[in-house]
Amino acid sequence: MQNSHLSQQRFSDLALHRIVQQAIKEKGFEFCTPIQALSLPITLKGQDIAGQAQTGTGKTIAFLTATFHHLLQKNNINSSEQPRALILAPTRELVVQIANDANFLVQATGLKTGLAYGGEGYDKQLKVIDRGIDILIGTTGRVIDYVKQGIIRLDYIQVVVLDEADRMFDLGFIRDIRYLLRKCPVPQQRLTMLFSATLSYKVRELAFEHMNDPQYVEIEPLQKTGHRIREELFYPSNQDKMALLMTLLEEEWPERCIIFSNTKHRCEEIWGYLSADGHRVGLLTGDVMQKKRLSLLKQFTDGTLDVLVATDVAARGLHIPDVTHVFNYDLPDDCEDYVHRIGRTGRAGESGISISFACEEYAINLPAIEEYIGHSIPVSQYDAKALIEDLPTPHRIKRGAFDSRSNLQRTVKRLKKTY
């Protein structure tokens, strides 16, 4: 980890609970990131906060540190075995990631965490919750399900965290969030924290209805795309697009890269060509079953896979270390998605490379993206005659356990036969 992205604020100088302080030290964290340096002095006093910073800047450790500190400071016995902290995130992958990031604090403090997310693991999640937990980390839908069944009560909540808050609002979870917050003690009786890469005025206005005189802190990047990311743009014809991608992969030979496309079908096509060419590649789209999604992310993180082809489902909130390259096979329709996509590289002080294709179909999105990020993306030329000519016959996706939609279709067919 490079020190260039850290502040001068030492964790040891913060008024942290001694157990949390020791865990932070043993983890090797000495200096705070800017968002941690600004937010922790506020939250450690028990004051609500809305924090805005780019992904990969330490938001998760900021709110986890404050959460564990707050629960230990209260020092009350959780005889109810009901959660005392509620951490909400927009996706199940982010829920799992937050839980993984919290492991070192769990081991140090003895506080117990439980997960609540849809897609799989219902009984497994229930068993953990039934044994009693201190911190519940989940998506809104599954948490509401448990609350309505009487499995979970939120009367004892002392800390609430909304991570990627703007994304939750954008996805239409505002009604769910309001429902859960109203089940918690009033804002004056709890600590509430919001953290996100982007936090619009609309989101803050809505969220502040459920907060107690919050302070707003912002870490403004030098540029929206991050100054450690080298951006490059090509104008390929539709015919050259796949050949250009495969040629660049051979030339760049990235240690670990993510290729983004706008549609599931295009992602499957890219995966098919790269798989046939011998790349260690995974496919992450909305149709991939939850168990497979988590397995793919683990394989990509531990280096079993070198390439991940993804839709924007993977573009927000997921911390995957050491991503060297991001390819925008399609320029996204949403300008913010461009920033979030290339933000997968150049994280935590490291450098990264972003390569985008302004093809015949999606070049129309380029002016709005460049206006949004505040600069033109440097253009590179390519020699069509130098591109890989003999593309392999692409592998086809085998529909089955890999595809949640096909499982649903088979279930429907069985029900029709039964009834």
Swiss-Prot record:
Keywords carried by this UniProt record: ATP-binding, Cytoplasm, Helicase, Hydrolase, Nucleotide-binding, RNA-binding
Keyword Cytoplasm: yes
GO process annotations (BP): RNA catabolic process
Residues annotated as domain Helicase C-terminal: 241-388
Motif (DEAD box): 163-166
Broadest EC class assigned to this enzyme: hydrolase
Record's catalysed reaction(s): ATP + H2O = ADP + phosphate + H(+)
The Helicase ATP-binding domain, residue ranges: 40-217
Chief place where the protein resides: cytoplasm
GO CC term (a single one): cytosol
UniProt xrefs under Pfam families: DEAD, Helicase_C
Motif (Q motif): 9-37
The protein's Enzyme Commission number: 3.6.4.13
Subcellular location: Cytoplasm
Source taxon at top rank: Bacteria
InterPro entries: DEAD/DEAH_box_helicase_dom, DEAD_box_RNA_helicase, Helicase_ATP-bd, Helicase_C-like, P-loop_NTPase, RNA-helicase_DEAD-box_CS, RNA_helicase_ATP-dep_RhlB, RNA_helicase_DEAD_Q_motif
Binding site for ATP: A53, Q54, T55, G56, T57, G58, K59, T60
Any one GO molecular function term: ATP binding
Record bears the keyword Nucleotide-binding: yes
Stored HAMAP family: DEAD_helicase_RhlB
NCBIfam families (alphabetical): PRK04837.1
Quaternary structure annotation from Swiss-Prot or TrEMBL: Component of the RNA degradosome, which is a multiprotein complex involved in RNA processing and mRNA degradation.
Function: DEAD-box RNA helicase involved in RNA degradation. Has RNA-dependent ATPase activity and unwinds double-stranded RNA.
Family membership noted in the UniProt record: Belongs to the DEAD box helicase family. RhlB subfamily.
Name of the protein in question: ATP-dependent RNA helicase RhlB
Species annotation: Histophilus somni (strain 2336) (Haemophilus somnus)
Gene of this entry: rhlB
